[in-house]
Amino acid sequence: MEKAFDMNMIGDFVPTLTAYLPVTLYILTLSLLFGFVLGLFLALPRIYNIPIVNQLAKVYISFFRGTPIMVQLFIVFYGIPALTGLIGIDTSKMDPFYAAVATYALSNAAAAAEIIRAGVGSVDKGQTEAAYSIGLSGSQAFRRIVLPQALVQAFPNMGNMVISSLKDTSLAFSIGVMDMSGRGQTLITSSNHSLEVYIALSIVYYAVAVLFEWFFRVAEKRIKKNQTRIVTVFDMNIH
């Protein structure tokens, strides 16, 4: 039975939940790293309109952007053992942590692919032509000139993706991950103070999100300053 609201319990719950913040951040970090790498590979066929692969990338991105993250969590959590079982490998006792990382990585890849594609599209085509004029190949021009500038343009959206993914990790408890939200569920069961637990959770998540926003805002300003210098030097070398 739910107990009467107690403001003091919020202060007690915050440090208890914060102790599990490293688990949440670990899931977030790994899924962002893997997601960004996969997203880059998904973005390339979209950017260069590679037949068949482009269509497959479109379907992948559409699926992961068009379905709820909780549904994706359950598909991966139950789907991996089902698939590995077909080849005689038993992963039914797999730590749900890995299923959560895999799910968020796959989901982040879809978002990252579109962000990278938009970033590349925002780079002045004259930069690529200038790169060709000094003897760079297509791949060299992309790696050295286009991609760095595209990532700078995409940086604000990347920041939004990180914060969105942070909030999405709050659902990892649904497959048994003991992160902040998972610990919150056990606190609700043991204390019968649901509202206080959710308020405490919101405080911790909000504090982390604000820190991330501040970091990306400061980093964006510094990166844009460096980009201006790099582009200026590149233009001077051409002329």
Curated annotation (Swiss-Prot):
- What molecular function terms (GO) are annotated for this protein? transmembrane transporter activity
Keyword annotations for this protein, in alphabetical order, are: Amino-acid transport, Cell membrane, Membrane, Transmembrane, Transmembrane helix, Transport
Q: Report the subcellular localization.
A: Cell membrane
Primary localization:
membrane
May I have one GO cellular component term? Answer: plasma membrane
**Topology of this chain in the membrane:** Multi-pass membrane protein
Query: CDD domains recorded for this chain?
Result: TM_PBP2 (cd06261)
Q: What does the entry give for GO biological process?
A: amino acid transport
Highest taxon of source: Bacteria
- What Pfam families does the record tag this protein with? BPD_transp_1
Would the keyword Endoplasmic reticulum be found if you checked this record's keyword annotation?
no
Gene3D superfamilies on file = MetI-like
Where is the ABC transmembrane type-1 domain positioned along the sequence?
Answer: 21-216
Kindly summarize what the UniProt induction comment says about this protein's expression. More strongly expressed in the presence of methionine than in the presence of sulfate.
Q: Does the keyword Transcription regulation apply?
A: no
Q: Which PROSITE patterns match?
A: ABC_TM1 (PS50928)
Q: Which residues cross the membrane?
A: 25-45, 69-89, 96-116, 196-216
Family designation:
Belongs to the binding-protein-dependent transport system permease family.
| Quaternary structure and partners | The complex is composed of two ATP-binding proteins (TcyN), two transmembrane proteins (TcyL and TcyM) and two solute-binding proteins (TcyJ and TcyK).
The task this protein performs is described as:
Part of the ABC transporter complex TcyJKLMN involved in L-cystine import. Probably responsible for the translocation of the substrate across the membrane. Is also involved in cystathionine, djenkolate, and S-methylcysteine transport.
Q: What is this protein called?
A: L-cystine transport system permease protein TcyL
| Species the sequence originates in | Bacillus subtilis (strain 168)
